[in-house]
Amino acid sequence: YFREHFLIPVAAAAIIIALVTFLAVRFISPDARPALYAAVVDDALTTSEATNLQNELEDKLGVSVIIDDYFDMDKDGLTKLQTMLSSKQIDVIIAPHKIFKQLAGYGYLTNLELTVSKSDNTKLDDATVQLKGFSDADDDGIDSSGTGKGASKSYGLKLSDATGWTSIADSDHSALIGIATGTKNTGTAQRFIDWLYR
């Protein structure tokens, strides 16, 4: 009698309860984010070299690292970057000078004065690049944008001075690096920068 009348509903209920429990646990405890997420914009590094750098950093720093080189500004790279920055997933941005200047103007990078001053690495002083940031002044007109109208600050570092970067064969030696606005992993980002400028 049980098999004929109750087996299918009980089995279906058990499957539904298991599925709901699995989904609830999955949403409550998402995957741990990496200790360092570096966004490499517009082919400043090839995919194979990004993978090699990621593996080397994980060994050297002893933390989980993602070097994401899928930020093509001619396609959907800016949208992806904005989405990930708004959810505070990106720690470091590496981009060609022209794109980096644009990103600093949007307000996507932090002032590196504290990073440089906390580091014992003297190479960082010479590598610092001053760029105009974002201005959110109240006196801006309704139709004006604050992009690139902020004060010039140390938003980037020249990677041409970084031995860890220039030793990579296919890297863009004119690229800049900076720490993303809102990162929760500033310490790891600083360790990564110090490692590049070793």
Q: What label would you give each PLM region?
A:
Residues 153-169, 174:
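Long, glycine/tryptophan/cysteine-rich extracytoplasmic
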Residues 5-27:
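Hydrophobic membrane-insertion alpha-helices, especially the h-region
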Residues 24-31, 165-169:
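Short boundary motifs at domain starts and secondary-structure transition points
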Residues 184-195:
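Short amphipathic alpha-helical coupling segments at ligand-binding clamshell hinges
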